[in-house]
């Protein structure tokens, strides 16, 4: 299974390379790239199974996020991991924001990575879903109300302001905020903001259930 790593940190590249080797991926099938141009070329040449990208590699140039988005869309059979460039925050969780895109951080546990990759490999091999690891591969989806509220929340509105604007009780706002935190798997507002911004940058945004 060809694997591509785009990360400027030697330690991370080595760690991911050793990790994938321990899973049976041959060293010759693990490729490091240093920029988006190389990433695009290697994805087209190798049709990788997995791509690891550090957000730091594409947040500093204006059109980079758009190019990453394009690469992800062009390779629906490849599983992309994006590590958030977020300091001093411990986030061990992961979020499927698309069927082939997971947002996480470098604090992710190897056991979690094991489960995510085995679920992906089972899906690729069309093995019985009954023996899947049980991990949820449904992309993160918010209700329309949660989505509207999240936008206000990110714009700096507090619970009372949101309550007034949406004409719902403050208790209901708090309940919706609780649901958003549960779905994004964190109570840390900084992580929530970061996830939303990153998802907006590399996709068309968090899915909204418009039923």
Curated annotation (Swiss-Prot):
InterPro entries: RcsA, Sig_transdc_resp-reg_C-effctor, Tscrpt_reg_LuxR_C
Ranges annotated as DNA-binding: 159-178
Keyword Nuclease: no
GO terms, biological process: regulation of DNA-templated transcription
Entry keywords, A to Z: DNA-binding, Sensory transduction, Transcription, Transcription regulation
Domain HTH luxR-type: 135-200
Molecular function GO labels: DNA binding
Source superkingdom: Bacteria
Transmembrane stretches, start-end: none
Function summary: Component of the Rcs signaling system, which controls transcription of numerous genes. Binds to DNA to regulate expression of genes.
Sequence similarity: Belongs to the RcsA family.
Name of the protein in question: Transcriptional regulatory protein RcsA
